[in-house]
From Swiss-Prot:
S-S bonds: none
Record text on subunit structure and interactions: Component of the ribosomal small subunit (SSU) processome composed of at least 40 protein subunits and snoRNA U3.
GO cellular component, one term: small-subunit processome
Acidic residues composition bias: residue spans: 48-78, 111-155
Basic residues biased stretches: 1-12
Stretches with biased composition (Basic and acidic residues): 13-35, 363-374
Protein name, entry field: U3 small nucleolar RNA-associated protein 25
Subcellular location as annotated: Nucleus, Nucleolus
Gene Ontology biological process: maturation of SSU-rRNA from tricistronic rRNA transcript (SSU-rRNA, 5.8S rRNA, LSU-rRNA)
Encoding gene, per UniProt annotation: UTP25
Organism: Debaryomyces hansenii (strain ATCC 36239 / CBS 767 / BCRC 21394 / JCM 1990 / NBRC 0083 / IGC 2968) (Yeast)
NAD found in the keyword field: no
Pfam annotation, one family: Utp25_C
Species lineage: Eukaryota, Fungi, Dikarya, Ascomycota, Saccharomycotina
Length: 719
């Protein structure tokens, strides 16, 4: 058996598990918590910013390393909390702690500028790397930006954020409260790309112009200072799919995009370009309005009292405008590298520290599948939340959240700041003015714990408790009126769709510019079933379910009343039955029922099972001492075990990842190869309902899925 992949450790308790859990101590530098709520105009802060100044040394608040990990395991009363603790117990004692001694960092004079105050300490695995919630105001190096000549009133940025009237927003808010049906404004099939997309709009949407088509980013509303670096890094022309994606992004429409294969990363360059474009356009708008106010003030000083004071609303409550949620530090490292390449900054502050905390050359074992190696390569620690700030000539990492332009975080890292057990230390105001939200590699995040994503949404665009020296004369009225969610753009990227992921755009989004859903075309030719390579009996058994809400209960009753009683009678072997259960909560319920209400000899392995018990149960199942074994989807995701001795397979539900279906079926193929099972006697049985249509389509193709879900017959067999 190959050695288990050693994944980075992290904190062993979620905040909701115990309010008494040990928390990382914080090391405070300068801390100025401002509660100023003045509404008078500020004196222009950047008047003297013409000359190139050295960026003021930052005094970052860093979380102190914790040497003693919180113990994993133990009894957990709240089943909801178990979904994340499962992974922690699974990995305890299984991974190595980085014990390298810390070394001080010397400043690099050229490309990378390190702050003198920076100590290049490794962020402990239990720390939230990058966390800096100081309310300090860094000195901006902002001078007048070079004019790209793109101050166009037809620019989607202007149309979406600056030209919408207060009356329009108020009317739309009232309409959307009644939950009207969004209409399909467009539907198209892109045969060459293998996609279809649908575009939905609310009643009376924001109209950001017609479709733009072009093979160059120059055809889109992108700032010229970004076009050259982008074309230098990516000289190839945009294909049709990339063009539609970029056009939708710059028009601030919501996107739910399934990138189909784990190694498809072409979309990342587009959303990074869009995020930078949004940041630079926001900054340029503010600087130009500063100049207008300065001109007005100069005119007033000269005695010109007949000039009307301009009302220039161009900001939110706080500076951060883009939030990017990612599953691991390595994913964050890759996005920051893209930001650096595309932004054209001459200096990058704290880059050496960032590389040390976020990058790693570690790779999973070669025995693991390619998608597993892609997901867990590099530093796969999932505790991080880092601010990124842009000035005229530099990019600054580890900036205070309140002076950052972009915040890149894992959902768990961010949620532990938002809902710190110590209420006095909770911070969420820096999310009050997020205008572009990106959720990338959403399937990986879902396997960690989707509850943390829901926590983040709870605090997005929430009116801040403190106003952090905000200038209310510059804040847009839709921010003040708590209507920012109507204009926030949500970009969601996943390898395959699930109800949780679809829910972000379908239910949590109220974007008045509309929403697009990109769906890959899965046919009987390219579906996962067609790639297995085994002529094995595959039985699909449908059960009746009245609604998605009652589906778990209907599935359980069908299993205990119809499937379980005939389980041993319907198989040709009295051992080697693997029961795969996607949901951990269903797994607990079945495990308890089989233990208390049946006489089956069975074992179970899940996210909480200790390493010794995992090995023992797998060995006893392979030898036939244990007849039945329960196996969870999340355990398979994080460990990718090769289960020996499988002769028959029962899927309590369809796996969310179609690759898992192929891997599970091949467990039987391995037994056939070892001549402990016969291909004609072994079988797979899959339980499903009509609500599983999306997952079913990935397995059998879009031609068969409607038949399996809606026809009279309830059982179908494939080979």
């Amino acid at each position: 058996m190959p050695a288990p992949y050693k994944r980075k450790k992290h904190s062993g308790k979620r905040p909701e598990d115990s309010h008494d859990a040990k928390r990382p101590k914080q090391k405070h530098g300068r801390q100025e918590m401002r509660t100023i709520t003045r509404t008078a105009r500020r004196v222009r802060r950047d008047e003297e910013g013409e000359e190139d100044e050295q960026v003021e040394e930052n005094v970052n608040e860093e979380l102190e390393s914790q040497d003693d990990d919180i113990e994993d395991g133990g009894d957990i009363d709240d089943d909801k909390g178990k979904a994340y603790d499962a992974l922690l117990t699974l990995l305890s004692g299984d991974h190595q702690e980085d014990t390298k001694k810390n070394t001080s960092v010397r400043a690099e004079p050229e490309q990378t500028q390190e702050s003198e105050s920076e100590s290049d300490e490794d962020s402990g695995d239990d720390e939230i790397a990058g966390a800096n919630v100081d309310d300090d105001k860094d000195v901006d190096e902002e001078g007048p930006e070079e004019d790209d000549g793109d101050d166009d009133q037809q620019d989607p940025f202007e149309v979406h954020f600056n030209q919408v009237s207060d009356t329009f927003i108020e009317e739309q808010e009232k309409v959307l409260k009644d939950k009207p049906k969004w209409t399909f404004a467009d539907k198209k099939s892109m045969e060459d790309a293998g996609y279809t997309y649908t575009f939905q709009v609310p009643p009376n949407p924001i109209k950001t112009g017609g479709k733009v088509k072009g093979q160059s980013v120059n055809n889109y509303s992108i700032k010229q200072r970004l076009v050259s670096p982008f074309e230098k890094q990516h000289p190839e022309s945009l294909n049709e799919l990339e063009g539609v994606l970029l056009d939708s992004m710059v028009k601030y429409q919501d996107i739910n995009y399934v990138y189909k294969t784990f190694d498809n990363e072409s979309y990342k360059k587009l959303y990074v370009l869009h995020a930078l474009n949004h940041i630079f356009k926001t900054r340029d708008r503010i600087l130009k309005n500063n100049n207008k106010l300065h001109s007005y003030q100069e005119s007033m000083k000269k005695g010109k009292t007949n000039i009307e004071e301009p009302e220039l609303r161009d900001q939110g409550f706080t500076r951060p405008k883009v939030l990017i949620l990612l599953p691991t530090r390595n994913a964050c490292y890759e996005i920051v590298e893209l930001l650096i390449k595309l932004c054209g900054s001459e200096q990058q502050e704290n880059r050496k520290k960032f590389n040390k905390q976020f990058s790693s050359k570690e790779t999973p074992p070669d025995s693991k599948p390619e998608d597993f190696k892609h997901s867990f390569k590099g530093n796969n620690n999932d505790f991080f939340c880092i601010g990124v700030k842009f000035t005229r000539k530099s990019l600054k990492l580890y900036s205070s959240f309140y002076s950052s332009d972009i915040i890149i975080a894992s959902p768990i890292g961010l949620s532990m700041i938002l809902e710190n057990p110590d209420k006095k230390k909770r911070q969420y105001d820096f999310l009050s003015s997020i205008e572009v939200l990106v959720v990338d590699r959403a399937n990986q995040i879902e396997m960690q714990n989707w509850d943390h994503v829901n926590t983040v949404f709870k605090y997005l665009n929430k009116i801040p408790k403190d106003f952090h020296d905000a200038d209310f004369s510059r804040i847009r009225m839709w921010s003040i009126n708590d209507q920012a969610n109507l204009l926030r753009q949500n970009l969601v990227f996943s390898e395959f769709s699930t109800p949780n992921i679809n829910n972000i755009v379908s239910s949590k989004s109220s974007n008045l510019s509309g929403k697009l859903r990109f769906k890959p075309v899965t046919t009987s030719k390219n579906c996962i079933m067609n790639s297995i390579g085994l002529k094995l009996k595959q039985i699909f058994q449908r059960f009746e379910s009245n609604s998605p809400m009652t589906d778990p209960e209907s599935r359980f009753k069908f299993f205990i009343n119809s499937v379980l009683p005939s389980l041993t009678r319907s198989t040709s072997y009295d051992d080697g039955l693997l029961i795969f259960i996607p949901s951990y909560y269903d797994y607990l319920r079945i495990k308890n029922y089989m233990k208390t209400s049946t006489k089956f000899t069975f074992a179970s392995i899940d996210e909480y099972t200790s390493q010794s018990k995992l090995s023992r149960n797998r060995q006893q199942f392979a030898s036939g001492k244990i007849k039945i074994m329960l196996y969870t989807e999340r355990l398979h995701h994080f460990r990718r075990f090769e289960i020996n001795g499988v002769k028959n397979l029962l899927m309590y539900g369809l796996p969310s990842n179609p690759i898992f279906y192929k891997e599970l079926v091949r467990f039987i193929g391995k037994s056939v190869f070892r001549e402990i099972a016969d291909l004609d006697l072994s079988f797979i049985k899959i339980l499903y309902s009509k609500w599983d249509a999306v997952a079913l389509e990935r397995i059998v193709g879009n031609e068969r899925a409607p038949v399996l879900c809606n026809s009279v017959n309830e059982m179908y067999e494939f080979r």
